[in-house]
Amino acid sequence: MLPRLFLLVLLGFSSAALLRGAAPLTSPKQHFGFAIGDDYQLATYTQTEAYFKKLAAESDRARLVDIGRTEEGRTQWMMIFSAPENLAKLDRYREIARRLARAEDLTDDQARALAAEGKAVVWIDGGLHASETVGTHQLIETVWQLASASDPEMLRILRDTIVLCVHANPDGQELVSNWYMREPEPTKRVLTTTPRLYQKYIGHDNNRDFYMSAMKETTNLNRQLYLEWFPQVVYNHHQSGPAGTVMFVPPFRDPFNHVYDPLVIVGVETFGNAIQSRFLREGKPGATSRSGANYSTWWNGGLRTTTYFHNMIGLLTEVIGNPTPMRIPFIARRQLPANDLTSPVPPQEWRFRQSIDYSLAANRAVLDQASRYREVLLYNIYLMGRNSIRRGSDDHWTTRPARLDQISRLAAADRTGSENNEDSPEPGEGPPSGGARLPQKYWDLLRQPDWRDPRGYIIPADQPDFPTAVKFINTLVKTGVAIHRATADFSVGAKRYPAGSYVVKTAQAFRPHVLDQFEPQDHPNDFRYEGGPPNRPYDVAGWTLAFQMGIAFDRVLAAFEGPFERLPYGQLQTPPPGRLPNARAPVAGFLLSPRANDSFILVNRLLKQGAEVFRVTTPLPAAPAFGPGAIYVPDRGQARDLVRTSARQLGLDVVTVPAAPAVENLLRLAPTRIALWDRFGGSMPSGWTRWLLEQFEFPFEVVYPARIDAGKLRDRFDAIILVGGALSAPGVRPPPTPRPRNLPPEFEGWVGRLTPEHSVPALREFLHAGGTVVTIGSSTGLASHLGLPLQSALTERNAEGRLRTLPDDKFYIPGSILSVRVDPTQPVAWGLPERLDVYFDRSAVFARPSNLPGFQPIAWFETETPLRSGWAWGQKHLKNGISLASIPVGAGRLHLFGSEVAFRGQTHGTFKLLFNSLQLATAKPAAAR
């Protein structure tokens, strides 16, 4: 009795401490002038930032942490909430979370002791997709609740957990809220398309950047997730819920990825069930899961999904809601209770505050679950990390669909003509399920040595584009992966590697993420029913980053050691300084490799300075490995200093030559006047391309449809880039053109779209006048608009003999990586290898024309099995199809890049296609001067 009484007294003192505040707390209504969730009201980031600062100053439960700058220069904030006594030991609890997540040098007993001492760390974010306004505003209300609520449940949550409340997109909130609130009459306010993307470059794709970490905001968030705090639970708020429901809640539909720990999926289901259970207790109907939407746990790259590959429980909800009142529609199939929709919601008018309340209830459910199972969460993240380390330290096999299919086909072939029925059940067993029953020998085949998971990967320092390999290493560094670097030359097996090579071992906690970035994804064949249409993957099916970036690496299947130094976690790498010989003999000029992407940065700097720069059309004896297209810079004036300083900075090795190459083999470069298409509301492919051009220091101008339609483009531009979505193919209905009411005058010139009637004649005129047009993805349809006799390779004749596009049940390749054969003698392909990985997302593929003079195939599908990573149903239809091509049109040139050569800033392996096409747009034979 006495110990229990003593405990109650202690709890009472603790609760009293939580109830005390240093000063009265400012409510959202007092600060913003309206309650969060009021109709027709949105808060700006400027107001939200001020509120965070005010609340942090007033509450002893809160800390405010600056986590970095956004792309537009704003401060990105994270608020940390816990009991005051926990905040006093915040560094200790963060250290416990870090040690358990990395699972290094810990015994199980030590991990249990740390789990008993630690606090569950829960991440709740808001605002990543700024037009999804519930997310930002539930975050504001959540920080208020965490700072002010004094009910027993909240006090327990604060004692047991550390809550990270993270603003995911400050720039977007400022843009969207100001755009909505610009209408002075509240009842006329409507959430419409903003003039530009709600993240400076990539808009909605800010949730597609989390393994690449290209954007500043992504890097800020990843640092907190994988280098600082290691939360066991990450809750990512989104909109909008499926029509006829209120909210999509975990668990998710299949497939889930084969490389991560099953405890991840069990944890996701546990928390999803906790949310749904709370909704039912509180009388909140309308939550759906699994088949209620197409969200899955297959893909890496989103804020929520990348956590799975780091042994964290990633939660996503998608809720309806709008500051302008809306209505839940009547959808008959959403009114019948089912496993994935246990409590349908009636059609009704719906208010913003109702969505806020659902989000708050979901947050409470997650925090309550984390509080109740604090030790389990902490120990489980250790257990998953320990499992990863053990799997990477021993022989381990990941079961993949393609291997199972291969074994099944082998077994079927073995059974042909055999009277032995392997499928007959044993006595006492039911009928076979899940496929044929196979003998043990086929299981043993699945464990053949060559199918083992790698123990590690070696990225050689002597590969043609090592600076890009370093960029790849930095994507791993930013996501918390342990990296080693060789301090001396070493050998593994029969191969020799130079000092400076990087080594990534799989015996580490984040092994799933390591495997995912090096190994091909093997997406299962996923159809609604046998012979039916495919189930579209959530986002993409294959993305192996090492393939996309064109990195040379070796898989090592057995244990290996060497002179390796382990780099500090989070330490970004730079390439070794480029080498430039100190030639004693006279030097005529310098050669740069066309195989290194960063050579284009140096070329752009030289052109900006007015230096002479040439491309060499044939291989040179001084640098035979460069192949055709080497960059030649005469040793003159300031060019010498710029080559020396930039080459060292960029890690570019320079070759000196005593004599200039023959003038007939030189193309003189000049600055290219580049136009990049965009539209009102912003195009994500255009935004990514804008970011890419800035990174590689290309000068360019963004142009809108009205400027293209105005014609006389050759007077101002040398090259025009039309990314995917700029121009619809003939016969394809274009998307509607947004035109908000009360459009400010400065945006009038942004409205409109490219059309066959007005835009194509202007582009034809530009081409005939000597301009270059680079088309990517769907915009390659310009060739048909121009009347060029090009046909798709992905067609068949129907019963009536008419040509039609192959249906999805015969050919379907969502986002995946395919291999093509390249002709590196083509100028646009200079610097590329003969085999290239390209990103393919239902992309254009051309049949070889028989009557198109000057048509130049650049890359084509050479085999019936080009799949490298992802899902390719009916890939045999690609054989001999052309992926990349170039055509002369008048005095100009049209480049057709059916595959996505600049996809999301990730496809470094194909950037040269874009860069060459731009720099060569103004190239002239040097002899013609």
Q: For the regions a protein language model found, what residue spans apply to each?
A:
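Short, solvent-exposed turn/loop segments enriched in Gly/Ser/Thr/Pro and often Arg
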Residues: 165-170, 180, 236-244, 779
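N-terminal secretory signal peptides that target proteins for export/translocation
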Residues: 1-2
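Divalent-metal coordination cores built from histidine and acidic residues
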Residues: 153, 161-166, 170-208
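Bacterial N-terminal signal peptides
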Residues: 5-17
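Intrinsic-disorder/low-complexity accessory segments
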Residues: 22-161, 202-203, 208-209, 214-216, ...
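Feature marks short, surface-exposed loop/turn motifs that line or immediately flank catalytic pockets
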Residues: 171-172, 241-243, 323, 728
